[in-house]
From Swiss-Prot:
A biological-process GO annotation: protein folding
Any one GO CC term of the record: cytoplasm
Name this protein carries in UniProt: Urease accessory protein UreE
Disulfide bonds: none
Family statement: Belongs to the UreE family.
Keywords: Chaperone, Cytoplasm, Nickel, Nickel insertion
GO molecular function: nickel cation binding; unfolded protein binding
Keyword Ligase attributed: no
Compartments, record wording: Cytoplasm
Keyword Chaperone: yes
Annotated CDD domains: UreE
Native source organism of the sequence: Yersinia pseudotuberculosis serotype O:1b (strain IP 31758)
Length: 231
């Protein structure tokens, strides 16, 4: 096993490494979005190298990271991360709305995303939602809930990853298929206090839990079945 404790550079972001490896052969270490969030893992490259990744805590691999380079053979071990696509919802339009409309829309959007068990991160007046179903279904949910006035589009996860902190990347890509959702929808005013609206864990599906000093039941449908659960 070859132990990897440091990242040498990034062939996509670092012009020095891009130039250095322009004629090199890439031996890819292909990771899915779950594996990419781990600072320690063991996996073989496409050419069969047994690699043990042991990075510092909170250091995660990025697409294009160079893990090893043999100058004699001109072969570089480079990370390739396969991330799922992301729905990007633009909240900028809400800045022109009244405070009441802004709060109402943010709350309803948070509820709609949470009700679908979709994880989300908000940043730079946008909401990022990793795809867990077909784009046609996500498009339908947005329109069914009356969010046609909010522009949204679908982009590659690799385009969003550089905009995120490590913790945000873990939330968005580290197991987006999980059903225990933590939704975070904020006011597009980008104010840390006061008028900033933050909604966490809009819809969680554990066992019964309480809100304040009361409990209540509700039910909803998933596909071809219904179920009740407590809040």
């Amino acid at each position: 096993m070859i132990l990897i404790e440091h990242i040498l550079g990034n062939v996509k972001k670092d012009p020095v490494w891009r130039e250095k490896l322009k004629d090199a052969t890439f031996d890819l270490l292909i990771l899915d979005q779950r594996e990419a969030q781990k600072s320690r893992c063991r996996k073989s490259s496409t050419q069969g190298l047994d690699l043990g990744i042991s990075l510092d805590r909170n250091v995660v691999l990025a697409d294009g990271d160079v893990l090893a380079w043999d100058e004699e053979t001109n072969v570089a071990v480079v990370v390739q991360i396969n991330l799922r696509d992301v729905m990007v919802i633009d909240l900028s339009e809400l800045k022109s709305r009244s405070p009441d409309e802004l709060i109402k829309t943010c709350f309803e959007l948070g509820h709609a995303l949470g009700n679908q068990h979709w994880k989300a991160v908000t940043k730079h007046n946008e909401v990022y939602v990793p795809l867990t179903v077909a784009t046609t279904m996500m498009d339908s949910v947005m329109r069914t809930h009356g969010f046609q006035h909010l522009p949204f589009r679908f982009v590659k996860g690799a385009e969003i990853l550089p905009l995120l902190t490590n913790s945000e990347a873990r939330l968005l890509f580290g197991g987006a298929e999980d059903t225990d959702t933590h939704v975070h929808v904020a006011s597009p005013l980008d104010e840390p206090h006061g008028s900033g609206l933050h909604i966490h864990g809009i819809h969680s599906h554990g066992e019964g839990h309480s809100h304040g000093d009361h409990d209540h039941d509700h039910s909803h449908s998933h596909g071809d079945h219904d179920h009740d659960h407590k809040h």
